[in-house]
Amino acid sequence: MRTAIVYYSLSGNTAYVAEKIAERIKTLGEVDIIRIEPKKAYPDKGAKKFFWGGKSAVMGETPALQPYEFNIEKYDRIIFGTPVWASTFVPPLRTFINENPDVKDKKIAVFTCYSGGGADKATDKMKKHLGIEKFEAELILIDPKDKEKEENDAKIEAFCSALI
């Protein structure tokens, strides 16, 4: 089975988890990691980070993305990785989904990273945006780069086991 892990990461938490998941599921088949980035970067520090990221998320914006390589035909499964901004998934992933509407026809899993809550709402909004009822697997982590390594590793392992 060929899997694409498609994610956006501002502070590094989502990137950290994407690498951990890729490491664990590579025994299932080929895994490609696709980091998406908006053409205009979001501020990554201070009040501007929360204001511009939150505004963009709440308004449902779809920012233009940096070029990325993705061919839906190559993949059986898509794993989305997103920080939670204002109780929703990040705008760059909204753009990616809009640009690749056939992803909904693949097996889909999701992982979220957050500091302030709203992860369940974020995954529900992503399901609605994709037009699907459920994910193959879901993983929610609080600040995974900085929190208890063993606890997060166990959650990542359970998520990956659900994909088998």
Predicted ranges, named:
Residues 89, 119-120:
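Short, well-ordered alpha-helical microsegments
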